[in-house]
Amino acid sequence: MKKLIIAGKEFNSRLFLGTGKFNSNTVMEEAILASGCEMVTVAMKRIELDDKEDDMLKHIIHPHIQLLPNTSGVRTAEEAVFAAQMAREAFGTNWLKLEIHPDPRYLLPDSTETLKATEELVKLGFVVLPYCQADPTLCKRLEEAGAATVMPLAAPIGTNKGLQTRDFLRIIIEQASVPVVVDAGIGAPSHATEAMEMGADACLVNTAIAVAGQPVEMAIAFKEAVIAGRRAYEAGLGAVGQNLIASASSPLTSFLD
């Protein structure tokens, strides 16, 4: 399986994890390690920036993991830039998951503010991974603005509804020149497999693992699902559902003749 490359950095795993909703930091850490992921995102609002010994950080920081602070909770591009600068100073990384969703009920990303913030943050030297609507035109604009990836949603955050935007995701994947990370709404390993079979470069999962009866086992299931989907894509997955006429894999014609 090919390695994933983002901003010149190689990743063996194509599964990214979020850190919210786990019932304990210990379970969160066990799930992160079991998943084999190398990219972990954490909301700045959940971290005590003045406390270098913050207990949550102790469970996230490992040598093989790229920490990806996110700006969840900000409502404007201006707030996002301010939060990003704080994150860079606090965590010593210029990698950033950009999230701007002014509506606290549905947490849908604001496209105008996201594009504006991406342009500004790239100028400031950040590696920007923007969470965005599954809008092919917007994703191209974000790419042109210098985004290191685009992260279109599959469904609203935390809903576990799967690939509700699959038709738009296909277009985004086809057009993109940067990695496409399917983010939000992935609720089952089968959803992750489908996204990877479509050609997505990675999936970001949080709720489906964190609220599972056995989060560590679910993390392993997602790890295997992402690998299976990517292998199928790289192997040249056959067209599915486009031909309604049956075709035998081992016809008996010559044998009967």
UniProtKB/Swiss-Prot annotation:
GO terms for molecular function: thiazole synthase activity. Keywords: Cytoplasm, Schiff base, Thiamine biosynthesis, Transferase. It comes from the Bacteria. Its main location: cytoplasm. Pathway: Cofactor biosynthesis; thiamine diphosphate biosynthesis. It is found in: Cytoplasm. It catalyses: [ThiS sulfur-carrier protein]-C-terminal-Gly-aminoethanethioate + 2-iminoacetate + 1-deoxy-D-xylulose 5-phosphate = [ThiS sulfur-carrier protein]-C-terminal Gly-Gly + 2-[(2R,5Z)-2-carboxy-4-methylthiazol-5(2H)-ylidene]ethyl phosphate + 2 H2O + H(+). CDD domains: ThiG. This is Thiazole synthase. It comes from Phocaeicola vulgatus (strain ATCC 8482 / DSM 1447 / JCM 5826 / CCUG 4940 / NBRC 14291 / NCTC 11154).
